[in-house]
Amino acid sequence: MTTVVIMPGGFHPFHAGHLALYHSAQRAFPDAEVYVAATNDTAARPFPFVVKEKLAKLAGVEAGHFVQVKSPFRAEEITAQFDPQRDHLIFVRSDKDKNQPPMPGIIKKDGNPSYLQPLLGAKKIEPFSKHAYMAYLPTVEFGPGLTSATQIRTAWPTLNSKRKTALVMSLYPRTQGNEKLAQSVIKLLDAAIGTQDVAETMSISQTTANTSGAGAGMSASYQRRDNQPVDEDYLSEHRL
C-alpha cells in the first residue's frame, strides 16, 4: 500500500512559499510519494508548464516530482502509476486556500458523500478508487508580506531592476551570489508577467502600493542559504 500526496496548483510562478508547502507535505507524510501537479494552461495566467518546471527545479523540487497534468485535482498522469484498489490519495493545500474550491466533505444531491473528503477527522482512509482526501498545511510567508503568486505578479511590473534582483534572490535562494542566474530568472519573469520602466529613485511606498509590501525594504544582500550548485545557463534557453 502506497500513500500518494499531490500538491495541485497554478504556480504562476512557482516560488519559495510553494517549496515550503512541498517540504511541509514531505514532513507531514514521510512515507508518502509526494508530487506537484501543474497544467500547461495559459488562458488566464501567464506561465507555461516549461517555465513553471524550470522555476520549480531552481527552487528545489526533485526531478520527476513536478508533473504536467490536464487537471490538477484529478492528476491522472500521476495516479495512473498507482493501484486505485489499494493505494491512498491525499491532496495538500495551504491554509489560506481552505475556502477555495474544490471543497472536501460535500454531500452530493443523492445524499452520498463526495469523492473528495477532509483528511482531518477521517476515521478510516479508503483507497482512491473510493475517496481522495484533502489536507491543509500552514501558509508560509516567503518574502516581505508575500503569501501568494498573485502578489508577485501584481508587484513585479512596479519594481526597478535592483528590487527585481532582490525579490528573485528571496524567492529562489540558489540565485544568491550568482548574478547571471538571477538575471536569467528576471528575464523569465519579465517575459511572462511583463515589465515597465521604473525609476531607480522610486520610493518604497510607491513601489509597494497595493502589493501587500512586496519588495519593501529589500536589498540584494542576503545571508546565503540552500546554495546548491546550479548551472547558471540552464535557464537561459527557454521559449514562452
Regions found by a protein language model. Name each.
Residues 209:
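Short acidic (Asp/Glu) patches
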